[in-house]
């Protein structure tokens, strides 16, 4: 970090930044291959319940239009 930036930061901001750096240093790291495999399995498991992929039944949808408006 630039020394001039440290002079402009107050003590509380520096403490927060140190806490954040400690948190990030203690995070469990996964190889990308493991992360991709986990994400893929999650998507495949939850694909059945995703309303954007499998649209819900229109009969049970309270916001779906019931019929067309006829004027006459």
Curated annotation (Swiss-Prot):
Q: Lipid attachment points, S-farnesyl cysteine kind?
A: 69
Query: What does the UniProt keyword field contain?
Result: Acetylation, Cell membrane, Cell projection, Cytoplasm, Lipoprotein, Membrane, Methylation, Prenylation, Sensory transduction, Transducer, Vision
State the compartments where it is located: Cell membrane; Cytoplasm; Cell projection, Axon; Cell projection, Rhabdomere
Q: Do you know which InterPro entries this protein is assigned to?
A: G-protein_gamma-like_dom (IPR015898), GGL_sf (IPR036284), GNG13 (IPR039227), Gprotein-gamma (IPR001770)
List, alphabetically, the GO terms of the cellular component aspect: axon; cytoplasm; heterotrimeric G-protein complex; rhabdomere
What is the protein's membrane topology class? Lipid-anchor
Under Pfam families, the record lists: G-gamma
Q: Which residues carry this modification: Cysteine methyl ester?
A: 69
Q: Which GO terms describe its molecular function?
A: G-protein beta-subunit binding
Q: Which domain of life is it from?
A: Eukaryota
CDD domains, A to Z = GGL
Broad class of where this protein is predominantly found: membrane
Spell out the residue numbers of the propeptide.
Answer: 70-72
Gene Ontology biological process terms from the UniProt entry: phospholipase C-activating G protein-coupled receptor signaling pathway; sensory perception of taste; visual perception
Q: Which residues carry this modification: N-acetylaspartate?
A: 2
Q: What does this protein do?
A: Guanine nucleotide-binding proteins (G proteins) are involved as a modulator or transducer in various transmembrane signaling systems. The beta and gamma chains are required for the GTPase activity, for replacement of GDP by GTP, and for G protein-effector interaction. This subunit functions in visual transduction in the compound eye.
Assigned protein family = Belongs to the G protein gamma family.
Record note on quaternary structure: G proteins are composed of 3 units, alpha, beta and gamma. Interacts with Gbetae/Guanine nucleotide-binding protein subunit beta-2.
User: Can you say what this protein is called?
Assistant: Guanine nucleotide-binding protein subunit gamma-e
Question: According to the entry, what is the taxonomic lineage of the organism?
Answer: Eukaryota, Metazoa, Ecdysozoa, Arthropoda, Hexapoda
């Amino acid at each position: 970090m630039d020394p001039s930036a440290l002079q402009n930061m107050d003590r509380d901001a520096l403490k927060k930044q140190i806490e954040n750096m400690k948190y990030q240093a203690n995070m469990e790291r996964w190889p990308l291959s493991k992360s991709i495999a986990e994400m893929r399995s999650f998507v495949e498991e939850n694909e059945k319940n995703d309303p954007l992929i499998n649209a819900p039944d229109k009969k049970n949808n309270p916001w779906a239009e019931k019929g067309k408006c006829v004027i006459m």
